[in-house]
Amino acid sequence: MKIVLISGLSGSGKSVALRQMEDSGYFCVDNLPLEMLPALVSYHIERADETELAVSVDVRSGIDIGQAREQIAYLRGLGHRVEVLFVEAEESVLVRRFSETRRGHPLSNQDMTLLESLKKEREWLFPLKEIAYCIDTSKMNAQQLRHAVRQWLKVERTGLLVILESFGFKYGVPNNADFMFDMRSLPNPYYDPELRPYTGMDKPVWDYLDGQPLVQEMVDDIEKFLTHWLPRLEDESRSYVTVAIGCTGGQHRSVYVVEKLARRLKGRYELLIRHRQAQNLPSR
């Protein structure tokens, strides 16, 4: 049976993610105490219910991170496929969301401010984030988060999932990257008026960057680095690795390099491609 644990920071969109799981056909349970998870799985099996499970766990349920990882290992040992989805956002965004909704943080009390509560929650959940697929919702609305969850669900993962993500430095760096590479030293198609309207997925930009030796050297070096280190991470039983590729605006060079690496790594790893600035790319 496939079991998805959804966790993350309060205010980051866990409820939206759980609703998308329900819309995708999962049997969903919100705020389940972890010690009850094996009983829920057993009950589900006894009912001969083939519906996949999605369970939200967070600080409201008094989550013990050590226990969470033990429960995951236990269920995997029984043959279940257990995935972890972690939803997060930047601190300033979370503060704004709490201000807009006027809701209190689950850890807030007279002795702890909202910022202190957010910091404590982030530190508390970090060990769970380490083994999870992470979605940063800082620049997402609910519809975009739902789309990101649907894209993740489409990936049939049997081994290490490598997330290749392009981004623009001027919009901020992703905070969940395991490896980050900077493409700003490469020739920039943006300065060619004929190429500016295109993106790194379009043939004119591909033809231009394919003809740049420095670009090809960079792609070769990144591929060599990943080929060397990804097997080591896989040996450590890592489930997900995020490789972030950045350029100035996230339109040309980073998109091209991500697409190029995807072609080279295809067949060796399960891949998920994310273009972080997709909503900012020109439409033609």
From Swiss-Prot:
Which sites bind GTP?
A: D58, V59, R60, S61
GO MF annotations for this entry? Answer: ATP binding; GTP binding
What protein name does the entry list? Nucleotide-binding protein NMCC_0698
Query: Per its UniProt entry, which superkingdom is the organism in?
Result: Bacteria
Explain the purpose of this protein: Displays ATPase and GTPase activities.
Q: Which organism is it from?
A: Neisseria meningitidis serogroup C (strain 053442)
Q: Which residues bind ATP?
A: G8, L9, S10, G11, S12, G13, K14, S15
The record's annotation in Pfam families points to: PapZ_C (PF22740), RapZ-like_N (PF03668)
Q: What family does the entry list?
A: Belongs to the RapZ-like family.
InterPro entries reported in the protein's UniProt record: P-loop_NTPase (IPR027417), RapZ-like (IPR005337), RapZ-like_N (IPR053930), RapZ_C (IPR053931)
- Is ATP-binding there in the keyword field? yes
Q: Does the keyword ATP-binding apply?
A: yes
Keywords of the record: ATP-binding, GTP-binding, Nucleotide-binding
